[in-house]
Each structure stands twice: as structure tokens, then as C-alpha cells.
């Protein structure tokens, strides 16, 4: 009489490798989905513009210095949906911010 023995080792090592690879891919994709949090922990503006025409700007976000970045960042959202970093020390950018703040306070 033959007895069937169950073994803990898989009979197909290639199947095991494929399963482990799939598991690693799933884990990596989940980590990548949370990667946007990491980008918030550093300066967003590596290069800045000295100015941009006010008619092209939809909104402006001024980020104060903090643990994420030691400098003030001015990020303009343009009407075409793109974002542009502006130099907060530029006189033109300071005028843009002033006009947008005055426009918002009169409404």
C-alpha cells in the first residue's frame, strides 16, 4: 500500500520564484503609491522665474520656510494648468503677490 506524503517544499521551484517576484512587485507598487508624501518633505522649487505676466496666473501659493524647506517658495498655478516657481525676492513677483492679495481682499 502506497502512502501519499505531503511535503512543505514546493514541487516547482520556478513557480515559487514567480510567486515571490509577484509579491515583490505588489509591495513595490504600494510603496510607490505613497511616494507623493516624500516629495512634500523637500523644496518644490529648484529653479525660479523672475516674473510672469499676471494674466497667465490662476492662483498663487506662498509656502513659508519650515522643516520641508528652508526658503520661502512661491508657486503659481497657471491658467493652462502648469505650475511655475517664482523668485520671492524678485520685485515683479512681490508686485504680483500684492495685486493678488489686494484683489482677494476687495471681494
UniProtKB/Swiss-Prot annotation:
One of its GO terms (molecular function) is chemokine activity. Residues 1-34 form the signal peptide. Keywords: Chemotaxis, Cytokine, Disulfide bond, Inflammatory response, Secreted, Signal. Disulfide bonds join 43-69, 45-85. N-terminal processed form GRO-gamma(5-73) is produced by proteolytic cleavage after secretion from peripheral blood monocytes. Pfam families: IL8. It is found in: Secreted. One of its GO terms (biological process) is inflammatory response. PROSITE patterns: SMALL_CYTOKINES_CXC (PS00471). Ligand for CXCR2. Has chemotactic activity for neutrophils. May play a role in inflammation and exert its effects on endothelial cells in an autocrine fashion. In vitro, the processed form GRO-gamma(5-73) shows a fivefold higher chemotactic activity for neutrophilic granulocytes. Belongs to the intercrine alpha (chemokine CxC) family. This is C-X-C motif chemokine 3. The gene is CXCL3.
Amino acid at each position: 500500500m502506497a502512502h501519499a506524503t505531503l511535503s512543505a517544499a514546493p514541487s516547482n521551484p520556478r513557480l515559487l520564484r514567480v510567486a515571490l517576484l509577484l509579491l515583490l512587485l505588489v509591495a513595490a507598487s504600494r510603496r510607490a503609491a505613497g511616494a507623493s508624501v516624500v516629495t512634500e518633505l523637500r523644496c518644490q522649487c529648484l529653479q525660479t522665474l523672475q516674473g510672469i505676466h499676471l494674466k497667465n496666473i490662476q492662483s498663487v501659493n506662498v509656502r513659508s520656510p519650515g522643516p520641508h524647506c528652508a526658503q520661502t517658495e512661491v508657486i503659481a498655478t497657471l491658467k493652462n494648468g502648469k505650475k511655475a516657481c517664482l523668485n520671492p525676492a524678485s520685485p515683479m513677483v512681490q508686485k504680483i503677490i500684492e495685486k493678488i492679495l489686494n484683489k482677494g481682499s476687495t471681494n
